Amino acid sequence: MRLTQGAFSYLPDLTDAQIIKQIDYCLSRGWSVGVEWTDDPHPRNAYWELWGLPLFDVKDSSAILYEVNECRRLNPEGYIKLVAFNAARGTESSASAFIVQRPKSEPGFYLERTEAEGRMIRYTIHSYAVARNPEGSRY
């Protein structure tokens, strides 16, 4: 099951040339670009690990792609995404985010149903990868 988080998630994986174009677009808008990674693909896992130091003042797309490739080298089976942050007053939020690497195999999720008080039923989504393996060895 292909994880669909962020922009371009329904499209085929981006090439490095396409990633450079997206980085250039983000930088042309004045956004800071950062690299994040995780091995926990849960949809509510909004806090991925920041790769290295924030790249707030980096204006060279090839330097950012270098950081992406270093993250790929050390996390070959993890999810890696680029996040563009708009620091403009009144916005101060992520303006774009997209996955630039994913594991070769994405096992997907299962739905757990729990009966609660009365006739209430609660549903929880769990990742097969997280359920099977500890953090750091999920893929």
UniProtKB/Swiss-Prot annotation:
Signal peptide from the UniProt entry: none
Main location: plastid
Location(s), subcellular: Plastid, Chloroplast
Gene3D superfamilies: Ribulose bisphosphate carboxylase, small subunit (3.30.190.10)
GO cellular component annotations of the record: chloroplast
Record keywords, A-Z: Calvin cycle, Carbon dioxide fixation, Chloroplast, Photorespiration, Photosynthesis, Plastid
GO biological process: reductive pentose-phosphate cycle
Origin superkingdom: Eukaryota
A Pfam family this chain is assigned to: RuBisCO_small
Molecular functions per Gene Ontology: ribulose-bisphosphate carboxylase activity
Job description of the protein: RuBisCO catalyzes two reactions: the carboxylation of D-ribulose 1,5-bisphosphate, the primary event in carbon dioxide fixation, as well as the oxidative fragmentation of the pentose substrate in the photorespiration process. Both reactions occur simultaneously and in competition at the same active site. Although the small subunit is not catalytic it is essential for maximal activity.
Assigned protein family: Belongs to the RuBisCO small chain family.
Subunit structure: Heterohexadecamer of 8 large and 8 small subunits.
General remark: In this alga, in contrast to plants, the small subunit is encoded in the chloroplast. The basic functional RuBisCO is composed of a large chain homodimer in a 'head-to-tail' conformation. In form I RuBisCO this homodimer is arranged in a barrel-like tetramer with the small subunits forming a tetrameric 'cap' on each end of the 'barrel'.
Protein name (database record): Ribulose bisphosphate carboxylase small subunit
